[in-house]
Amino acid sequence: MKILEKDLRKGYLKILPEDQDDLWALYNIIKPLDRVTATTSRDIKHGETSSSRRIPMTLTIEVKTLEFQPFTERLRIRGIVVEGPERYGVKGHYHTLNIEPGKPLIIWKEKWSENELEIISRFTSRKQKVLLATFDYDEAAIALLTEQGIRLLEEFTSNIPGKREPVLFQKGLEKYLSSIAEKILDYINKFQVDIVVIASPGDLQKRVARIIKEKKPVNIITDTVSIGGQSGIRELLRRDSVREAVKETNIIKAQRILDEFHKNLSKNPDMVAYGIDDVEYAVKYNAVDKLLVSEELLRIYDEEVRRRVSSILNEAYKRRAEIIIVPHNSDVGLEVEGLGGIVALLRYPLKKPLNN
């Protein structure tokens, strides 16, 4: 995303979202009672007739609800119009702003938290785009690694004849590998991918990598997995070589933190905290080093819980903790939600209070 204008004394940022990940970031930043200004259109009736036409206009709404479906290119923000053209009489009425990549908006807040500004800062730097492909002799899957998690682009079967017919088997295999390479090339161009990670049992992945490199110079990492398809994608994400290559991606960082959390939970439980009460206590004593919070917890309807979570994040940020918001639809997000929506790795052992 790009920051087009910024005046924190007046409480606003004008932002240009550039892709789906930016919309997801805005979904986690904009809160009820914030105000959002954007160009939109609205049905306006003419006189006493029942006919109406859609009129373009710029409106400011006080936010009530937000809706964002992962891997879509639209963020819907619903609220009450507080500023708009007087001649259309829209003030006080509900309206929904549809925010898309390439469409600027202004966000107004009573006060921007340091954590919210950190999220903005992180998403204004260029994000690494990583394509993942896993396959075996039976099936293949291609996915895009994003800040929202794993976006499955395509899954297909090989249709290779059995090995009892060696000639047909080899022809079928070559056709299958070429097809995988062509699909990967198409997605490289479509998403302007920086890194491609290809994995399979044996060394089939190297053959696909050679086909791709003959047609396009691109950074390719090859590795092995025991199976293709979506299961292979999940296995691939746990490989150290892949984690090292894409370590700046938040979902990979989050998985690494969660793995360390589980390890400490069983062996050294005083080095972790989970659930609002325990994490709040750990933040109070400056013990939190890394923190994962589910996006669902940020948007919980209980206003008191939402206030506590916001306070935890702001205090943790001030005390230089690393904070990552994890998407609900990801494996990491579901695990974190099962642990109370928030987990932390600690800087030093901390005994929990008895009444906690």
Swiss-Prot record:
This is Protein pelota homolog. Pfam families: eRF1_1 (PF03463), eRF1_2 (PF03464), eRF1_3 (PF03465). The N-terminal domain has the RNA-binding Sm fold. It harbors the endoribonuclease activity. InterPro entries: eFR1_2_sf, eRF1_1_Pelota, eRF1_2, eRF1_3, Pelota/DOM34_N, Pelota_arc, Ribosomal_eL30-like_sf, Transl-rel_pelota. Monomer. It comes from the Archaea. It is found in: Cytoplasm. GO terms for biological process: nonfunctional rRNA decay; nuclear-transcribed mRNA catabolic process, no-go decay; nuclear-transcribed mRNA catabolic process, non-stop decay; ribosome disassembly; RNA surveillance. Belongs to the eukaryotic release factor 1 family. Pelota subfamily. Its cofactor is a divalent metal cation. Its EC number is 3.1.-.-. PANTHER family: PELOTA (PTHR10853), PROTEIN PELOTA HOMOLOG (PTHR10853:SF0). GO terms for cellular component: cytoplasm. Gene3D superfamilies: 3.30.1330.30, eRF1 domain 2, Pelota, domain A. Keywords: Cytoplasm, Endonuclease, Hydrolase, Metal-binding, Nuclease. One of its GO terms (molecular function) is endonuclease activity. Its main location: cytoplasm. The keyword Lipoprotein does not apply. The keyword Nuclease applies. May function in recognizing stalled ribosomes, interact with stem-loop structures in stalled mRNA molecules, and effect endonucleolytic cleavage of the mRNA. May play a role in the release non-functional ribosomes and degradation of damaged mRNAs. Has endoribonuclease activity.
